[in-house]
Amino acid sequence: MVLVFFIVNLLRIDLYDVVKEIKKGRDTMKTIIKRSILDYLKNPVLWIGLIIIVASMYQCLSSYLQIHYIKQNEQITQNDVALEDADVMDGYIPTSDDKERRREWEDTIKETLMDTSKNGFGFSRQEADHVMKEIQNMDVKTASEFLESQYGYYNAIYAYEDLEIHKGTAEEINHYIERKLSEHSFSWYFAKKFTDFAGLHMAFFATVLLSFLFIQDTRKSTYELLHTKPVTAIQYICGKVISGFISMLGVLVILNVIFFMLCLKTSLESGFPVTPIDFCVNSLIYIVPNLLMICCVYTIIALIFKNPLPAAPILFLHIIYSNMLTMKNDIYYMRPFSIMVRFPGRFFETHVAKMSNINQIILVISSVILVCISVTIWKRRRVH
């Protein structure tokens, strides 16, 4: 907050005056907000985009809605998926026994060493046993490096990673689901996956739709006329930001309602616990600040270039940047100023990337700063 007040003071904008001006020009702001929101509602891009988002997100999330306890004599689903994408609805669960996982990994290494095909090494049983004795007291990483340097056995570490999950029996799957649901409700996990995909879709959608926020106002004749009207910079800028923000919130609320109802349906059918607040909390923390930031970026770009369109490629590149999480010691970290929060991991193992909460606070502060700068730009270009 100290940084915010420093920037505001630097720009010679008194926050008290900002609040006072907003209260004073409340009717003017309401007019701007209503007009902008009506323009959005009349825009077919909003409705077409909403339909596309719902369909795309359903395709991404529908598999999680198939999760259920395996009934007696029920055949476990045999979905054709890559092992790295396999999850509990495909019949795969994490391998919890490290000793068993290590034993299976060593068996895989030994089989490959003794394989006489072009993919194997053609070792005899005695030679393979000798190699296994050499690595038996090493950890997996060290053993993999040893196999690569001494025998040219590359990527042994990936064979161990593939054993992170295994095809579970009905009893194992049910026990795993029951254990996870004793920690959190089904909606707690589903809401995180929903937020993951909703954040991605909303970032792209907001980048496209918000380009219309200033598109009419930045036409030369309209732009010059606006600067001669008795509307203050604070009233205009805040009115436009709020209208764009409310429009995006409306779309987000619709998505929350649709997918909460789907989550509730699955929970009732499968006997899973559900908590309605999970969707609201995740959306509020991990999506709302991103939408606010996108609105503010469009605002300042539109004022600098007198055209909002240059913001679109900038934001698309920013989305790509935000999607590229960094990893350190097997832990995912958010990139600074990301406008999208990801939740890596399988359904019941999902977790928010580290530094996400701090990043969201930074986005809110940055949004306030961008609004203050935008107000200053508007004032300096005003025709008296």
Per-segment meaning from a language model:
Residues G25-I53, V383:
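Aromatic- and glycine-rich beta-strand/loop motifs that create alpha-glucan
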Residues F5-T28:
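Short, Lys/Arg-enriched N-terminal segments with co-localized hydrophobic residues
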Residues I52-R101, E145, Y154-V208, L213, ...:
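Secretory targeting signals
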Residues L210-K229:
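Transmembrane helix boundary and interhelical loop/hinge segments in multi-pass membrane proteins
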Residues L83-I157:
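N-terminal accessory alpha/beta regions
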Residues D39, Q216, L264, L303, ...:
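Transmembrane helix-loop junction
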Residues V18-V19, C60-T112, T116, I177-F186, ...:
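Terminal transmembrane helical anchor/hairpin motif
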Residues T232-A233:
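Short coil/turn motifs that cap or connect alpha-helices
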